[in-house]
């Protein structure tokens, strides 16, 4: 890893280390713990960088630190409420933890600001399908509103 080489002088390159690029390569290689270290070093070079923070959240997710991932995504969204990637990541962590109602606004926010490139198509499709499942979207393409508490059955009617 570049930080190791920099620390012990392994590489003859005395230029600045690209910790972010290194982190991406490590994530691609499935080395999430090592990637997390690189992303943290990248964050020192660019404090508060939303892109780096989102990569940190993804690394947390992959190593099972989902609470930290949720906190990190929420931090990104405090700084940039339009951060589509943070909405996407947070939405699916919430769905996974059974907080589906809380995930819906994040799925909608992601879809409102979704990237349009070919690489994002699968993610956009997945978000649309999940939102449709959570909201009971009909074939019209319009999203049905969530029922109000008054429209829900009483607690004793559920059992």
Model regions and ranges:
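Conserved structural position within tetratricopeptide repeats
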Residues: 10, 41-44, 74-78, 109-112
């Amino acid at each position: 890893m570049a930080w190791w080489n920099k620390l012990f002088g392994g590489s003859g390159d005395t230029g600045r280390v690209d910790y972010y690029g290194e982190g991406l390569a490590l994530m691609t290689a499935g080395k999430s713990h090592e990637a997390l270290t690189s992303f943290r070093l990248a964050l020192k070079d660019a404090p508060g960088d939303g892109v780096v923070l989102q990569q940190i959240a993804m690394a947390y997710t992959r190593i099972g630190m989902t609470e930290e991932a949720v906190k990190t995504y929420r931090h990104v969204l405090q700084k940039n409420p339009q951060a589509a990637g943070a909405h996407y990541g947070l939405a699916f962590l919430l769905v996974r933890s059974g907080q589906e109602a809380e995930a819906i606004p994040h799925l909608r926010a992601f879809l409102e600001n979704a990237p349009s490139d070919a690489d994002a198509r699968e993610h956009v499709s997945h978000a649309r399908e999940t939102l449709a499942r959570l909201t009971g979207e009909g074939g019209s393409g319009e999203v049905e509103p969530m029922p109000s508490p008054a429209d829900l059955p009483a607690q004793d009617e559920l059992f």
